[in-house]
Amino acid sequence: MMKEKFIMADGTALHVADSGRGERCVVLIHGYLESMYVWDDFVPLLTPEVRVVTVDVPGHGISQVLGEVHTMEMMADVMRGMLDALGIERATFVGHSMGGYISLAFCARYPERLDGL
């Protein structure tokens, strides 16, 4: 069961949902003008096997807006802060559309925190 909550990630209020269990973790990142709810059909398929985290990236859903421009690198930094806030050392990132670009930026900046894309 996913638990929705707000966390602070590098000073940014993020709306996340976390299954909270599993040895491995998968982070699902939505696309432009979407929200974490686009993953609702996938979450039940994954949660028996892995910990699943979904997130409204900054400026989307009900997460905090940080300004007019949200670069992929800035969002990757916030994703690192999210992992830290949730106590997750490493994760596999799955991104749709813009979420894919955020995942690639995360890979470039924090390869040691990534299990896969």
Question: What do the predicted segments below correspond to?
Answer:
Residues 1-13:
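N-terminal cap/lid segment of alpha/beta-hydrolase-fold proteins
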Residues 9, 17, 53-95:
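Active-site loop/oxyanion-hole signature of alpha/beta-hydrolase fold enzymes
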Residues 11, 21-23, 48, 84-90, ...:
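Active-site acidic short loop of glycosyltransferases
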Residues 12-65:
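Conserved HGGG/HGGXW glycine-rich cap/lid loop of the alpha/beta-hydrolase fold
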Residues 40, 80, 104-108:
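Short, hydrophobic alpha-helix immediately C-terminal to the catalytic nucleophile
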Residues 43-47, 69-72, 110-111:
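Glycine-rich, phosphate-binding/catalytic loops in enzymes
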Residues 89-117:
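Conserved hydrolase catalytic core segment
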